[in-house]
Amino acid sequence: MSRTSLEVKAQRKPKFSARAYNRCPVCGRPRAYMRKFGLCRICFRNMALRGELPGVRKSSW
């Protein structure tokens, strides 16, 4: 299946609530989804490095 059809399928209400899963709205990736930001780890990193996510900065210790 193509990624767009899987995104549409994920938006439908499942028969059982345990089957529901989150997808990144930018790229459609189902894994490594961060609920707090609503993005996958790859899109999160790209947007954070570009400064598009307020309050997020690269850690240093």
Swiss-Prot record:
Cofactor(s) listed: Zn(2+)
Pfam families (alphabetical): Ribosomal_S14
Cofactor note (record): Binds 1 zinc ion per subunit.
Keyword Lipid metabolism: no
One Gene Ontology cellular component: small ribosomal subunit
SUPFAM superfamilies, alphabetized: Glucocorticoid receptor-like (DNA-binding domain)
Keyword Methyltransferase found: no
Entry's Gene Ontology molecular function annotations: rRNA binding; structural constituent of ribosome; zinc ion binding
NCBIfam families: PRK08061.1
Protein family (similarity comment): Belongs to the universal ribosomal protein uS14 family. Zinc-binding uS14 subfamily.
Protein name: Small ribosomal subunit protein uS14
Source organism of this protein record: Nitratidesulfovibrio vulgaris (strain DSM 19637 / Miyazaki F)
